[in-house]
Amino acid sequence: MMALKESPSLMVRRTLPAVFALLFSSSVWAGQQTLFSFVRPASVVNVATEDAGMPQYNAEQTAEGEVLRRVVFNPAQRPTLRLSPQSGVWDWSSGKFLTLRLQSAMDWALTVDVTVQGSDGRTLTSRIDLPAGPAQTVMVPLTASSPLSQGMRAGPPMPWLHGGQRLLLTNSAGAVDLKQVASVSLSIPGPKVAQNLLIERVGIQDDDQAYQAAYRELIDAYGQSTRGSWPEKVANDEQLKAAANREQQQLKAWLAERGKQQLDAYGGLLAGPAFAAEGFFRTEKRDGRWYLITPDGHPFYSLGVNAVAADGGRTYTAGREAMFKALPGEGDALAAFYGEGNNDDGNASSQGRNFKKGRWFDFYAANLQRAYGKLCLPAAAGQPAACPPLVVDTGRWQAHALDRLQAWGFNTLGNWSEPALGQAGRMPYTLPLSIVGDYASISTGMDWWGRMPDPFDPRFAMATERAVAIAARDHRDDPWLIGYFADNELAWAAPGSEPRARYGLAYGTLRLTTDVPAKRAFLKQLRDKYRNQEGLSKAWGIELNVWELMEDPGFEAPLPSPEHPEIERDYQHFQQVFAETYFKTISDALKWHAPNHLLLGGRYAVSTPEAVNACAEFCDVLSFNFYTLKPQDGYDFARLAELDKPVLVSEFQFGSRDRGPFWPGPLELAREEDRGPAYANFLTAALQQPMIVGAHWFQYLDQPASGRLLDGENGHLGLVAITDVPYPGFIDAVRKANAQAMAQLRTGLEKKPAP
């Protein structure tokens, strides 16, 4: 490590002349205190480097006329530039943000980690994605902060121009005592070649005016971002109506083409050998390939869309009205689309998020009204104009949505779709089983949508019985229903591959009290195997003086180790029994209440081998949410082949940041134009796996740019924008890919001989 203390005499030698620097340095905002200037350094700060350096004595002028100092971060694990007070600590207690005037000196973006460390060793960290281009002022919040504090998953695009400067707001995590700041460091994680960064100054901002301005008037009257332009962006109602009229003509032509395809009433392929018609959807494996079979006895490849619903455009406005440029006033007709909600549910998905309850506005419904709503009748003599009440015309919307899906080559309504769409008798559909109740639950360390239900608790069986009975009540004899999903993305494990995550269910159970049935079941398993604490202590390599110590809350179980293989075997056995109990409970209830329909698996986001094995035993289909470029990247398909069960991709998605919503979703692509090829490639890869029987896109509609009600997600995920305008390039690519998939399956079936 090299420490550099700049003296006034060195300052003259190492920088450009002071007058020149004053002319070309960027302005300092009101409320900003300069901690250290790399252009005009003072002796009050220690500057140290590790695997980094400042090779030039002089600062340098950029193409824009700014004067900055070059820092070279050499190839190493974490080259670092560190600033610290010459004596004592800094008191930043009056500060709101750490500010840095930075510029990438490369032709590409740089990832820069900022760490603020307190005298007690605690840290506040921030990762800067510094784009190539001119210098910008980076603002790091001095308390943990993210766009969730503004009610949304991802914030507006950065940098943006404010006060004559390019401003880049970052997130921060952790905490420090701002009265006791010991250092601030900049590092670049693991560069393969030397990376050059230009820096002018480091400072403290005492107010949050720039931060508030970044979120002010961010959303326009149509629910779109005000910070960008794109081809489908709507500027006025006339444009909305014109787009709707053009689309209707296109849909008619595409639906006419679909009518020429050789399909049965449910979308099954009229090709190849016959299958038995049993009146409901079922599965069958033939010649090494799994199929869904329609009620009429034809092979069916499920091309679906999740969340085909008209309520996806709602976003909270209460407390953040300034974010919206043109919300309807109380006397405005569109005020009919306000409502009230509360999504403060205590789950991990809502932690750290503000603005999660109160008044919301439904931009999608308002846009439907603008495009398709009935006009007021002219006023008669002495009478006011007759205006129909503003409500979404559900019949028109449902027919339009079904027309779209069929014209675009889809044949299945995925999870969380409007129930009335399935009851229209035009398209097969799926339903969720949402099991809620007062049963015990276990934390695995993830808990995004909540803790794991305890299937050993009799109250879970009662809740399951109730949920299945309600779900099946109006669908028991409906041949259009394919089946039911067993909840969604349960926390079978914690994120990561380390043992504590892999066996999070076992660890979490043993930390609980014996009031929890799952813990009693686990302890019984161990007691039956080892008989007493001596046997368990020897097998696990621990000192357990009395068995009752395991019954205490907070018991910390040992990590698996090669020296004590029984630890891992015991965890695996418990998790296997746990998963079997869970899926058997649901399967038994479904066989009683809905014997004609399929159990479509658990829609895994994270899973364990035990959970997947149990699902294969008790469910008709395994289902996975794959946010990967192809299904094979999401799971070991050699392992799935051993289980010999059909697989449904229950969610997949590709998004970008160039169409309004600020979050691209779990799988980001560079441009909107990349989404279509990615969709086609995913389907091609899915068809290569003979156990995959379908793939469901997530989702129908873009999420609100200001964050959906449930958890603040604000992703560009949709086939359709919040304005109800489809993305034409993506739709065209999706339609062609769906048609190609069906043609490929038809060709394969026609080659197969009759059994």
Predicted regions and their residues:
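Beta-rich carbohydrate-recognition modules and glycan-binding surfaces
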Residues: 31-214
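Short, solvent-exposed loop/turn and secondary-structure capping segments
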Residues: 111-113, 151-153, 196-198, 214, ...
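N-terminal accessory beta-strand-rich subdomains and adjacent acidic, glycine-rich linkers
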Residues: 144-155, 166-176, 182-192, 203-280, ...
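Active-site-adjacent substrate/metal-binding segments within catalytic domains
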Residues: 230-422, 440-477, 564-565, 569-572, ...
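Active-site region of glycoside hydrolase catalytic domains
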Residues: 286-288, 294, 300-303, 377, ...
